[in-house]
Amino acid sequence: MAGSKKTNRREEILQALAQMLESTEGASRITTAKLAKQVGVSEAALYRHFPSKARMFEGLIEFIEEALMTRINRILDDEKDTLERIRMVMHLILAFSERNPGLTRILSGHALMFENERLRDRINQLFERIETQLRQILRERKIREGKSFPVEERILAAQILGQVEGSLNRFVRSDFKYQPTANFDEYWALLSAQIK
C-alpha cells in the first residue's frame, strides 16, 4: 500500500510539473516552491519522492523517450514502405507534442534553459536517437525497395528532423497556437516530393 501511494504521488508530481509547463508559468522558470504549491505538499515532501528538481525533469524525459521510441519501433515493425515510415514517424512526434504541450517545452529545450545541463544533453541524445532511426530507415530503402535517394541519407534525416523541430519550436513560441500537425499533409507532400 505504501509503495503504491509513493508511486501515485510521484506520478502526481510529474503530472503537476507537466501541467505547469503547459500553462503560462511554463514560459518562466518553475521553482520547487511553485510546484509544491501546485501539488498541495511541502517542498520537503517533493524531495521525499525526487532527490532534485532535475530528477523530476528526468522523469518527464524518460516518459517522453519511452513513449516516442516504443511507438517508433512499432511503426518500424508494422510498416515496410520507406516514405510511409518516415511520414508516420514525423506525424507521431508532431501529434505527441500537440497532445502534450508542456512536454513540448522540454523537447524544444525551452523549459530546460535554466536547468541542469545534463537535462539538455538527454534531450539532445533523444533527438540523436531519432535521427539515427531516420537515417536507418532511409538506408534500408536500397535493400527493401532497390531505390536510393538523390542525396545522402544523413542529409535527408537531418532535413526531416529539422522540419519536425521547427514545428515544435513554432508551437512553443506561439504559446501553443500553431498546432504541429496543422497542414501536415501539405508539408509532407512538399517534403516527400523533394526526397523521392
Swiss-Prot record:
GO cellular component, one term: bacterial nucleoid
Keywords linked to the UniProt accession: Cell cycle, Cell division, Coiled coil, Cytoplasm, DNA-binding
GO MF term list: DNA-binding transcription factor activity; transcription cis-regulatory region binding
Domain of life: Bacteria
Coiled coil is among the record's keywords: yes
Keyword Cell division: yes
Ranges for domain HTH tetR-type: 7-68
Compartments in which it is found: Cytoplasm, Nucleoid
Cited Gene3D superfamilies: Tetracycline Repressor, domain 2
Gene Ontology annotations of biological process type: cell division; negative regulation of division septum assembly
InterPro entries: Homeodomain-like_sf, HTH-type_TetR-like_transc_reg, HTH_TetR, NO_SlmA, SlmA-like_C, Tet_transcr_reg_TetR-rel_C_sf
DNA-binding region boundaries: 31-50
Coiled-coil features, chain-numbered ranges: 110-142
Subunit structure: Homodimer. Interacts with FtsZ.
Family indicated by similarity: Belongs to the nucleoid occlusion factor SlmA family.
Main function: Required for nucleoid occlusion (NO) phenomenon, which prevents Z-ring formation and cell division over the nucleoid. Acts as a DNA-associated cell division inhibitor that binds simultaneously chromosomal DNA and FtsZ, and disrupts the assembly of FtsZ polymers. SlmA-DNA-binding sequences (SBS) are dispersed on non-Ter regions of the chromosome, preventing FtsZ polymerization at these regions.
Protein name as catalogued: Nucleoid occlusion factor SlmA
Organism: Vibrio campbellii (strain ATCC BAA-1116)
Name of the coding gene: slmA
